Design a protein with these regions (language model features):
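Extended soluble regions of mature proteins
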Residues: 1-160
């Protein structure tokens, strides 16, 4: 279970990213007004610099790594104890699971809070209604405008 603990979260992040490393592609999906909308794009290349610094996250010994992505410097903490080369959002490619990643200004900060085995339905990529990235963003922004203009006191984008 990852949480975005950035210094400027606008609202709760509730998206799923499907990564296909063989094709260097990803599908971003998000449920907007009860529709699972998504778009495809190329996975960004991550050129990681491994750093000898260590710290514990939960009960895992983690190592530090840095990369530049989207015009920002990102710092990641990964563990070899879980040998999966994945992480939150678009981040991957380290020799273990990324448990924490943030930019140097803390505008983006994903942190592992727990590893929970759950019995729940998994949304599969073929359940996503594909559109263009621009159209998904436009649909999301229209929903946000609609919510901010209404008298709704609860954030409907947040799960209870």
């Amino acid at each position: 279970y990852f949480q975005n603990t950035s210094s400027k979260p606008l609202f709760k992040v509730n998206h799923v990213i499907y990564k296909d490393h063989r094709k260097s592609e990803m599908t971003y999906s998000e449920i907007i007004e009860n529709v699972n909308l998504g778009y495809n794009e190329k996975l960004p290349p991550m050129d990681w610099k491994l750093i000898s610094e260590k710290k514990k996250i939960l009960d895992y010994e983690c190592s530090k790594a840095e990369t530049f992505f989207g015009g920002r410097k990102f710092i990641a903490w990964y563990t070899n104890q879980i040998p999966i080369n994945e992480g939150p959002y678009k981040f991957s490619g380290l020799p273990g699971l990324i448990l924490e990643v943030s930019d140097d200004k803390n505008n983006f900060h994903y942190q592992l809070l727990a590893i929970i085995k759950k019995e729940q339905n998994i949304l599969y990529k073929n359940d996503v209604h594909l559109t263009e990235k621009k159209k998904l963003i436009e649909t999301k922004m229209n929903l946000i405008k609609k919510i901010t203009k209404s008298d709704v006191k609860v954030n409907p984008l947040e799960k209870k």
